[in-house]
Amino acid sequence: MTINLGIIMDPISSINIKKDSSFAILLEAQNRKYKIYYMELKDLYLKDNKPYSHTKLLRIKNNKKQWFTLEQQKDVSLSNLDVILMRKNPPINRAYIYATYILEQAERNGSYIINKPSSLRSYNEKLFTTTHFPQYIPKTLITSNSTKIHNFIKTYKDIIIKPLHGMAGLSIFRIKEHDPNTSVIIETMTKYETIPCISQNYITDIQKGDKRILIINGIPFPWCLARIPKKHENRGNLSIGGYGNTQKLSKNDWEIALSIAPTLNKKGIFFAGIDIIGTKLTEINITSPTCIQEIEQDTGISISTIILDNLEKNLKKRKTNRYL
């Protein structure tokens, strides 16, 4: 039976097909003859309390000049789709939040939404670590109060400060004690004490890499991508010039990943990417985890295949349970 798969993502015209994780998943889905319905956030709507979206049938190919075609525009009931992948990148703004409510209605009507809409809405990727796994994180302060941030710097001498809603290494600053730019950075980050941000002690092991570990259906993948900063940089993100080094998970990585995985499963988070620097957990990415292609290329193991095998297994379970 053909699986009807919906995907909500940023414009497909703007992706880098050599790196994009959604593209890798879609390519495998197409190989399995899934019918793929392409959507952007703006396409979703509720009518008479029923969830719909304007969609286009998506066909893709591994060609960097022309990698997609969109056909047969039509509005569909989200409840008629077997599975919907919510792969829209942050920020988690009002439009994103409203979309999760629409998806939640489709979920109530039987659609399988990855990841669970209420979890996408409830668990900030940086706060999630502090509220659920404080034993694994660096020294952390979340506040908009400039005096408290100044005192945190005094205590730890060398810190990282970043927005709670950011991604891809954007707006991340390293501040050392007596840095002449400290006050202006804090003013900028907190928007003059109106928006909280997260401060953590600087971890020197960042120079060995910020490790992205993928967890699929409650099972950690045994290889990770260590994203190593370029010279004179504190951020390892590939999008800003860091380079990737695929590694086997260390004993500490396994301990953290196996501790986190059951909670993710319980909360309907089918696919996540956790970030570890040294021995410390820094983020749990649940909106649109990346690094599939980089790890696949280095290991020869198709993560996309593992994802869709598990997705299909879960779909079968859901259908069986529905008829019990």
Swiss-Prot record:
<keyword id="KW-0436">Ligase</keyword>
<dbReference type="Pfam" id="PF02951">
    <property type="entry name" value="GSH-S_N"/>
</dbReference>
<dbReference type="GO" id="GO:0005524">
    <property type="term" value="F:ATP binding"/>
</dbReference>
<dbReference type="InterPro" id="IPR004218">
    <property type="entry name" value="GSHS_ATP-bd"/>
</dbReference>
<dbReference type="InterPro" id="IPR011761">
    <property type="entry name" value="ATP-grasp"/>
</dbReference>
<keyword id="KW-0460">Magnesium</keyword>
<dbReference type="InterPro" id="IPR004215">
    <property type="entry name" value="GSHS_N"/>
</dbReference>
<feature type="binding site">
    <location>
        <begin position="152"/>
        <end position="209"/>
    </location>
    <ligand>
        <name>ATP</name>
    </ligand>
</feature>
<dbReference type="GO" id="GO:0004363">
    <property type="term" value="F:glutathione synthase activity"/>
</dbReference>
<protein>
    <recommendedName>
        <fullName>Glutathione synthetase</fullName>
        <ecNumber>6.3.2.3</ecNumber>
    </recommendedName>
</protein>
<keyword id="KW-0464">Manganese</keyword>
<comment type="pathway">
    <text>Sulfur metabolism; glutathione biosynthesis; glutathione from L-cysteine and L-glutamate: step 2/2.</text>
</comment>
<feature type="binding site">
    <location>
        <position position="285"/>
    </location>
    <ligand>
        <name>Mg(2+)</name>
    </ligand>
</feature>
<dbReference type="GO" id="GO:0046872">
    <property type="term" value="F:metal ion binding"/>
</dbReference>
<keyword id="KW-0067">ATP-binding</keyword>
<dbReference type="InterPro" id="IPR006284">
    <property type="entry name" value="Glut_synth_pro"/>
</dbReference>
<keyword id="KW-0547">Nucleotide-binding</keyword>
<keyword id="KW-0479">Metal-binding</keyword>
<keyword id="KW-0317">Glutathione biosynthesis</keyword>
<feature type="domain" description="ATP-grasp">
    <location>
        <begin position="125"/>
        <end position="312"/>
    </location>
</feature>
<dbReference type="Pfam" id="PF02955">
    <property type="entry name" value="GSH-S_ATP"/>
</dbReference>
<dbReference type="InterPro" id="IPR013815">
    <property type="entry name" value="ATP_grasp_subdomain_1"/>
</dbReference>
<feature type="binding site">
    <location>
        <position position="283"/>
    </location>
    <ligand>
        <name>Mg(2+)</name>
    </ligand>
</feature>
<comment type="similarity">
    <text>Belongs to the prokaryotic GSH synthase family.</text>
</comment>
<dbReference type="InterPro" id="IPR016185">
    <property type="entry name" value="PreATP-grasp_dom_sf"/>
</dbReference>
<dbReference type="GO" id="GO:0005737">
    <property type="term" value="C:cytoplasm"/>
</dbReference>
